[in-house]
Amino acid sequence: MQNFIEQIQKCENLNDLEAIRISVLGKKGILTEGFTKLKELEDEAKKEFAAKLNAQKEIFNEAYLAKFKDLENLALEERMKQDALNFNYFDESITTGALHPVMSTMDKIIEYFIALNFSIEKGPLIEDDFHNFEALNLPKSHPARDMQDTFYFDDKRLLRTQTSPVQIRTMLAQKPPIRMIAPGAVFRRDFDITHTPMFHQVEGLVVEEGQKVSFANLKSVLEDFLRYMFGDVKVRFRPSFFPFTEPSAEVDISCVFCKGKGCRVCKHTGWLEVLGCGIVDPNVYNFVGYENVSGYAFGLGVERFAMLLHQIPDLRSLFEGDLRLLEQFR
């Protein structure tokens, strides 16, 4: 047995150790054969011989298990070395990912308004008629509803056509002052070179008690915002109509492609329409129970901004997943 103990101590791997175990405790092992011969002995001799065999087996098992544990730990350490990650290795064939141009544009817009202490508010994509239309001064008989082709589930539920319902939900849940933006996906039944059935908007709302908010405040914020997004551009406000603001305006910037000189993109006017805005209509305040307040609202299409920032001619290409296009925005 001493010979086997010495062999165990010299073992350098688990396979050799297992071979020793089989030679001792296997079906034809030395100790196994010894236990088999017990039946040939008389009672007293059997008892004495069995005690010796068990003692040797115990000594062997103790040496075997100790060595097995050591070799198993060494094998584990070796596997860990082989499997370890080399954090200094760089495979140039693997490229890093990048934000989609719509998401990077959305992030830039949000970043600006967060710096002005605007909160980010969210609402459901599936809306009801009250929040999406009626509370925004668009009753069922209002002709302005024809301006939007809507995805209806039934008479009461629809896919929101704008993020303006988030403004209504926020005003119903909070008291003034409110400074918020509502970024998110919206849906309209439209699909062409400048429209897709799903797109993204960022709408903003500011409401203060009393008559503290004026169109001049709105104009100042939007002019600074547009120059933050597009650089040194000219900004103009044109009178327009929106059911939920009065007065209302469309906002244009000097064409970022031709620097205002006139080109095919701006239809040779030198101007590009980028967003709508206005002073919140008093009728909207009636729906949310506000009194003696003033405020302004604005809304913009994120895809429109992304197209202008990255000079993308077809809006639909933003949603086709073409890697040749997306790789340009790394």
UniProtKB/Swiss-Prot annotation:
Binds 2 magnesium ions per tetramer. Keywords: Aminoacyl-tRNA synthetase, ATP-binding, Cytoplasm, Ligase, Magnesium, Metal-binding, Nucleotide-binding, Protein biosynthesis. It catalyses: tRNA(Phe) + L-phenylalanine + ATP = L-phenylalanyl-tRNA(Phe) + AMP + diphosphate + H(+). PANTHER family: PHENYLALANINE--TRNA LIGASE, MITOCHONDRIAL (PTHR11538:SF41), PHENYLALANYL-TRNA SYNTHETASE (PTHR11538). GO terms for cellular component: cytoplasm. Belongs to the class-II aminoacyl-tRNA synthetase family. Phe-tRNA synthetase alpha subunit type 1 subfamily. It comes from the Bacteria. This is Phenylalanine--tRNA ligase alpha subunit. It comes from Campylobacter jejuni subsp. jejuni serotype O:2 (strain ATCC 700819 / NCTC 11168). The lineage of its organism: Bacteria, Pseudomonadati, Campylobacterota, Epsilonproteobacteria, Campylobacterales. Its cofactor is Mg(2+). It is an enzyme of class 6 (ligase). Its EC number is 6.1.1.20. Its main location: cytoplasm.
